[in-house]
Each structure stands twice: as C-alpha cells, then as structure tokens.
Amino acid sequence: MLIEQFICREDNFGVLIHDERSGYTAAIDAPESKAICSALKRRNWTLQTIFVTHHHHDHIEALAELKQIYKAVVIGPEAEKEKIGHLDQALQPDESLFFGTHTLLALSTPGHTLGSLSYYFPQENLLFSGDTLFSLGCGRLFEGTPAQMLNSFKKLRQLPDETLLYCGHEYTKTNALFALTLDSHNQKLHQRVEDVFLLRAKNAMTLPVTLGQEKATNPFLRWDDRTLRKNLAMEKETDEEVFAEIRKRKDNF
C-alpha cells in the first residue's frame, strides 16, 4: 500500500492511501479540495473512497466537491451521519470492511467527538487516528469525557508497537514542549523532541511515527507510568484521574 501525506489548510494533514493491486485510492478525511486534487494529480491516482474520522468542519469541508469531481464513496461513523452529511456508507463502532484487497477496522474512539473513528489496517500495521491520538498529544475533549478518551487510548495502546501512526494535524512541536513539562527525565522523549525540532526546522512533517515511540514518549499514553505519576504528584489516583489531569494541563498550556 502506498501513502501520500501532505499539508492542507494550515496544519491539517491530508492523506491518500493507494492499493497497488486493485488501483483503488482513498482519502482519510477531506480537509481541502485543492490540496487533495493536486496530490491525486501528482501521483496519477483517481479517488474512489473517502474515510471520514469525525464531523468537524476542517475534516469534511471538501466532501461535496470531491464527490462531485470523482464520484467518490464517502464512508464514516453512523453516530455522526447527520452532522457529516454526504455519507454513502455509515459504519458501526469497530466494524470491519475492505478497501481494495485490504481489510481495515473502523475502531470506535470517542472523546474528541462522540462518534470519532480511527481506521486501522492490521495486516499493514497502519493507524489513521484523526483527532483522537496525535503524535505526543491527544485531541481536545469537545464532546466526550476523560473516561471515554482514556478507554479509546487503552484500545489504541494495545495495537502493535510497529504500527505506523498518521493523525489529523501537525501539532507535534507544541505537543513535544508540553510533554517535557511532565516528563523531563524521559531520555526517549528528549530524543524525540530533538528529532521533531530538526524536522520542523526543515519544514518537514513529523509523521508517520511508530506507536512504540508514542507509547514511550506521549504522556497521554503513559497514564500508568510510575515516574510520570510521581511528577504529577498523583501516585495513588485512578487512571482516569491521571488522564484527566494531563488533559487539563494541556488545555491550559
């Protein structure tokens, strides 16, 4: 499977996935028509499908135009069907489906929105998490609760370390600075921060990243880490309380 990643709008990631065997191409979300069409033209691909992660405007703005141009089939969460509009196929939580010759799972990951989906290709170890899991970060809880987002992160943390993560926004540099405020003695985090700053200095993208790297450095995936809990002075609190505190601190960062 081939992947084309590019920037849309200001900091949205545009992502195209292409199955070489079938010739099928899909977009993960539809943040900007011009950027997506340019990427398709650059690769000489034709868009057949759009997988929507959630209903926020910066992820669905180009749906109508892309449907008109390519007659693409739009697939997304049943729970947000009315808010998204343009859906041709509505998915139930954790439903499995095919893209070309590949199987994918529409993992239910509520928190950022109540119907948020993360698309996981188990055979290829690819995860497209939308605005749920960011590199070194976590989506804001616009609709869900800390408990819901924690359960979503527990689900994602179970995926293999070699899984490649693609997410919805280039927020990694800011997330890295926040992570250091909580986990300053984490040498793996310091190395990751250095790498991120070097990439951004060249205006290069910081994704994809392996889930293993995220498990070792992303504070939102480390709610049960003893050192992090000690740094938060929350050694005896519940996982939910720790996760909620990290999210609260990020909101105020």
Curated annotation (Swiss-Prot):
Monomer. One of its GO terms (molecular function) is metal ion binding. Binds 2 Zn(2+) ions per subunit. Pathway: Secondary metabolite metabolism; methylglyoxal degradation; (R)-lactate from methylglyoxal: step 2/2. It holds the Pfam family HAGH_C. One of its GO terms (biological process) is methylglyoxal catabolic process to D-lactate via S-lactoyl-glutathione. This is Hydroxyacylglutathione hydrolase. Belongs to the metallo-beta-lactamase superfamily. Glyoxalase II family. Keywords: Hydrolase, Metal-binding, Zinc. Its EC number is 3.1.2.6. Zn(2+) 1 binds at residues 54, 56, 112, 131.
